Amino acid sequence: MFTGTYRVRVDDKGRLAIPAAFRKQLPEGSFVSLSLDRVLAIYPPELWTALADSLLSPLQGPDQREVARTLYSLSEAFEPDGQGRIILRPEQRRLAEIGSPASVVVIGSGSRVEIWQEARWDSYSADAQGRFTESADRVNSTR
């Protein structure tokens, strides 16, 4: 399970050093992709496979095809270099509004890792923390 928050830099070549705590848990063949809320997500292979399989069906509608095409075209398997860095493609960075160089926030999000543009994370996090109790109450009421 991925937990924690780390502030790191994306260098001028688009390289991001994955925090060591996450790197230890990510197996070979993990994927980086665009996710919801204009963030990038790192998925272990088994989670990526489950997500990709959920988009495959013989009778896809136009929305499902669009989501599948966008997701697949913006996703890439990676192997960190010797310093634990991965390269975020320019198109991935553009859609997540991450420059190079840039400060980003890498968070554990349970089964995956998310990469946020720093100012957007700071705003989102402050708002979400302020609503935590009422959001948790709503989640619990639907169980």
What are the residue ranges of the model-derived segments?
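Flexible "stalk/tail and boundary" regions
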Residues: 1-7, 12, 22-83, 90-143
